[in-house]
């Protein structure tokens, strides 16, 4: 299931992950924070990277400018 809906809104899991990524985290840290299975986090993070909302550097995931804007819109 895509994490970004056709209307541009985010699925609830994607919303939760980008809220966690206000500071950089590894996939494992995201799992611990949200109590989700690693496979679900990895697949959602992969889609967020493809959507240019999240970037990965040395195993750490963080928000891009567009991702940070999504967090502001949700707040």
Predicted segments with their positions:
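Short capping segments at the starts of secondary-structure elements
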Residues: 21-29
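Minor-groove-contacting beta-hairpin "wing" of winged helix-turn-helix DNA-binding domains
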Residues: 59-66
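Short, charged/polar, Gly/Pro-enriched secondary-structure boundary elements
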Residues: 68-73
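A short, conserved structural fragment
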Residues: 49-59
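Short amphipathic alpha-helical interaction segments
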Residues: 36-49
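Residues within the alpha-helical elements of helix-turn-helix
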Residues: 33
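Short alpha-helical segments that sit at the start of domains
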Residues: 1-17, 38-40, 62, 74-75
């Amino acid at each position: 299931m895509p994490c970004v809906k056709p209307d541009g809104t985010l699925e609830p899991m994607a919303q939760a992950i980008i809220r966690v990524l206000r500071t950089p985290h590894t996939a494992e840290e995201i799992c611990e924070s949200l109590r989700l299975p690693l496979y679900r986090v990895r697949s959602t993070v992969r889609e967020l990277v493809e959507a240019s909302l999240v970037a990965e550097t040395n195993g750490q995931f963080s928000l891009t400018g567009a991702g940070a804007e999504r967090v502001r819109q949700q707040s």
